[in-house]
Design a protein with these regions (language model features):
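Intracellular juxtamembrane helix-capping segments at the cytosolic ends
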Residues: 111-124, 314-328
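A late C-terminal transmembrane helix in Major Facilitator Superfamily
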Residues: 325-361, 369
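Cytoplasmic helix-loop-helix junction between adjacent transmembrane helices
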Residues: 101-137
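Helix-loop-helix hairpin linking two adjacent transmembrane segments in secondary transporters
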Residues: 127, 131-186
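Extracytoplasmic gate region of multi-pass secondary transporters
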Residues: 26-27, 206-251, 258
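C-terminal transmembrane helical hairpin of 12-TM major facilitator-type secondary transporters
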Residues: 274-319
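Conserved MFS/SLC helix-loop-helix module at the cytosolic interface between two early adjacent transmembrane helices
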Residues: 57-94
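Helix-to-loop junctions at the C-terminal end of transmembrane segments
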Residues: 58-70, 260-273, 358
Length: 404
């Protein structure tokens, strides 16, 4: 039987194609925005940082409320905030007002996350990991398409703002589509009697689980965020690549992340435990980073770009969220809020640390990321072993129950 929520899921995924564009729109149009806002690159960078602050400010709050009031209102609110950002950022010459619109875009990201991830897990309860990993494919697709769109606008000598307008147009059409779609029921609509049939400890997330998954949310985000920001500079100034070649490393990185999504999704759905992939991908990320730090040569860096895109940016963050959400079966929005709040903190702290390290050597930045990946692997190992222990314990209880 066809899943009735497939059209809804498709609309939710298209939101993240636009989100993928939104994340890099200002950085790719930096020169034009400098002129528009009468500022310099540092001023535009300050506005870009507002996205992270806006995201963190409401993420946990939005997740909790989505469990109570439903997913649709927050998804629609996120789409409206994003459209306001796309239009507003182009119609101001004041950097302070631009910062406010950037903050609004960060809030939009939080509202979408709080409603989308739980909706997909509730729409596809038998394959929540696959459903969430596909989000990454659409984000990467948006980030792959936007440079092509901007290149076309430059070639045709058209207004740079059309890149914002195209993103806003896709979001508007998708909002009309999703408004007519049916969303799966969320736990807040279910009768409390259902909870009485289940042991209170069976679905309770311990402090240890909460801490380990939250820390993994920070570590996994930090690992790929650092690479995405410094890969080109590492290729140019450490490996000795030309500027044009170092920029292409990001395209190789994106191809790796997309390929991982399409390989990982069927694996999780059919054969492999999510915890196994969590441990495997984190371990490979550590080995790749360690290798490129020891041998920063032309070809090693090219191979590294693909491998690190595959293992760190190809859905491992979403796998971690899916595993955490299993500990919160009646509060998936809360789980999403906690997990991505930890990840958002990484987007603040990592740039501060790397800014200091870059004054000494860009090579030190990758060594720092290697240390982060090592901690991430130990953490993934702990999560995996703990998850298997709980699964084994649950199986023993089920086997004993009939005889008791």
């Amino acid at each position: 039987m066809k899943n009735p929520y497939f059209p809804t899921a498709l609309g939710l995924y298209f939101n993240y194609l636009v989100h993928g564009m939104g994340v890099i729109l200002m950085s790719l149009n930096m020169a034009s925005l400098e002129t528009l806002w009468q500022t310099n690159a540092a001023g535009v960078s300050i506005v870009i940082s507002s996205l992270g602050i806006g995201r963190l400010s409401v993420l946990l709050f939005a997740g909790l409320l989505s469990d109570r009031f439903g997913r649709r209102p927050f998804i629609m609110l996120g789409m409206c905030c994003y459209m306001a950002f796309f239009f507003g950022i182009l119609h101001t010459n004041n950097i302070i007002i631009a910062y406010v619109f950037g903050f609004l875009a960060g809030m939009a990201n939080s509202f979408l996350d709080a409603g989308t991830y739980p909706s997909l897990m509730e729409a596809f309860p038998r394959s929540p990991g696959t459903a969430n990993i596909l989000i990454k494919a659409f984000v990467s697709s948006g980030q792959f398409l936007l440079p092509l769109i901007i290149s076309l606008l430059v070639w045709a000598e058209l207004w740079f703002g059309w890149s914002f307008m195209i993103a806003a147009g896709i979001m508007f059409i998708n909002a009309l589509f999703l408004y007519r779609c049916t969303f799966p029921p969320h736990p807040g609509r279910r009768l409390p009697v259902i909870k009485k049939t289940t042991s209170s400890t069976e679905h309770r997330c311990s402090i240890t689980d909460l801490a380990s998954y939250s820390l993994y949310g920070y570590i996994s985000m930090a690992t790929f965020y650092l690479v995405s920001q410094w890969l080109a500079q590492y290729g140019q100034f450490v490996a000795g690549m030309s500027y044009t070649m170092s920029i292409k490393l990001l395209s190789i990185y994106t191809v790796g992340s997309l390929l991982c999504v399409f390989i990982t999704a069927p694996l999780i759905r059919n054969t492999v435990r999510p915890t196994t992939l969590l441990m495997l991908y984190t371990f490979i990320s550590f080995i790749a980073l360690f290798t490129v730090c020891l041998h920063p040569t032309f070809y090693v860096v090219i191979i590294f770009a693909f491998v690190i895109g595959f293992t760190s940016a190809g859905g491992v963050v979403q796998i971690g969220l899916t595993l955490m959400a299993e500990r919160f079966p009646y509060a998936k929005g809360k789980a999403t809020g906690i997990y991505y709040s930890a990840g958002s903190i990484a987007t603040f702290t990592i740039p501060l640390i790397t800014a200091h390290l870059s004054q000494r050597s860009i090579a030190d930045i990758m060594w720092f990321d290697t240390a982060i990946a090592a901690i991430g692997f130990l953490l993934a190992l702990f999560i995996g072993l703990r998850s298997r222990k709980k699964t084994r314990h649950h199986s023993l209880k089920e086997n004993v129950a009939p005889g008791g």
